[in-house]
Amino acid sequence: MFTRVVEMTSKSGKAQDLANTINEKAVPILRKQRGFVDEIVLVSSGDPRVLALSFWDNKGDADEYQREQYQKIHDIVRHLLETEPEIRTFDVHTSTAHKVTGKQAA
């Protein structure tokens, strides 16, 4: 399993709006992507940061999404962002909620 972590800084007072927009407009697009497993959105209670963690069957599926659909989602949320998102990627080592290929879930 593979994950993309997209760290965003919302405009002042817009973190909840950003999270809601991701849920209402981005998640339906994600659900249609090959290999998409789950999306978790975290909203900071102390600052305007929002993290969007998307889980994928494998890196190839996540890369395909990045090439073919990410810009569309970025355009949907752009008006709520203070800065450009920072994207990091990771192999999932352990999960208690997802089956992780090649590793045993805790």
Q: What kind of feature is each model-predicted range?
A:
Residues 24-25, 29-37, 55-89:
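An amphipathic, aromatic/His-enriched active-site/gating alpha helix that lines ligand/cofactor pockets
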Residues 23, 70, 102-106:
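Short intrinsically disordered coil segments
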